[in-house]
From Swiss-Prot:
The keyword Nucleus does not apply. It is an enzyme of class 2 (transferase). Keywords: Amino-acid biosynthesis, Aminotransferase, Cytoplasm, Pyridoxal phosphate, Pyridoxine biosynthesis, Serine biosynthesis, Transferase. This is Phosphoserine aminotransferase. SUPFAM superfamilies: PLP-dependent transferases (SSF53383). It comes from Bordetella avium (strain 197N). Binds 1 pyridoxal phosphate per subunit. Signal peptide: none annotated. One of its GO terms (biological process) is L-serine biosynthetic process.
Amino acid sequence: MARPWNFSAGPSALPESVLQQAAAEMLDWHGSGMSVMEMSHRGRQFVQICDEAEADLRELMNVPADYAIMFMQGGGLGENAIVPMNLIGRRGLPAADFVVTGHWSTRSHKEAGRYGDAQIAASSAQAVNIDGHEQRPFTWVPPLSDWRVRPEAAYLHLCSNETIGGVEFTEWPDLAAFGAPDVPLVVDASSHFLSRPLDVTRTGLLFAGAQKNAGPAGVTVVIARRDLLGKALSICPSAFDYANVAAEHSRYNTPPTFAIYVAGLVYKWVKAQGGVQGLEAANKAKADLLYGYLDASGFYRNPVHPAVRSRMNVPFVLHDESLNDAFLKGAEAAGLLALKGHKSVGGMRASIYNAMPLAGVQALVDYLKEFERLHG
């Protein structure tokens, strides 16, 4: 029986070959007689798994040696606290700046305020007119000329792909241009991690929950410049102190072993697809197909300004919201799952991450056409 197409925003679809390999190795990993779930996190088998995952990720993202790669717990929401506990006091005055472009950067800003002075450097929380497009709040990105970054800030945080709103940064700023060359950029890249080339060297720290593009829920990837480590607040738990985690190669405490193993399988799958460059081409083709149909239709509408539309998360609304339930019921019957939009914005959302093939997006477009034919 064919599997349905899963458009969940996260946890999301994994490559089928990864699931098959994990299933085949479930009871006996490489002749060890053990499942990965049964291994000691300090035993040689898991050390090999963890180190290989780190090496593959470093290769895929061109991560220099002066950056540490850490596999942690807590998800992106946890990192909203762990980042300030590690970085906000590094320059004495606990202060950090935020670019607020949606739900997740709003939560990051609010959480950091518990640990210091968290100020908004730029925001898209208001409606604007851009090139004749009337844009609702959080459907656009503030131009760099409007950013106000304090030179004394410990870091500047942005969410480079807002999963709920479907807003994506296509490039990251050079903070020297704002007169803040000593302010490192912190990026929440959770929902477009490994979907396109990302220049880690433009950041001081990058984090990503794996459950969207890079594995199952339970492991969070943190990539941090080593010179930023070792300056955690005294209230930071030792297990969340980046200096401790990096020094022990993600094994300071018991890490999420099985999640790291599956993430490692995903990294090998990404390499087999031609790396992030190969996936970028595939993701662009999928996004072009879906946005192309939505834009041509008078029945559906994507609210995001075209210049900052996400390739990963595509929100859309029907012209008649009373049809929402019928749309979702019909979609599920057609084998198209998890298309309901986030409760904070409503409507629909198709998350078309790396593991979603073009055929899945084509199946969605075919359904969109048929539903419009019946109800338009």
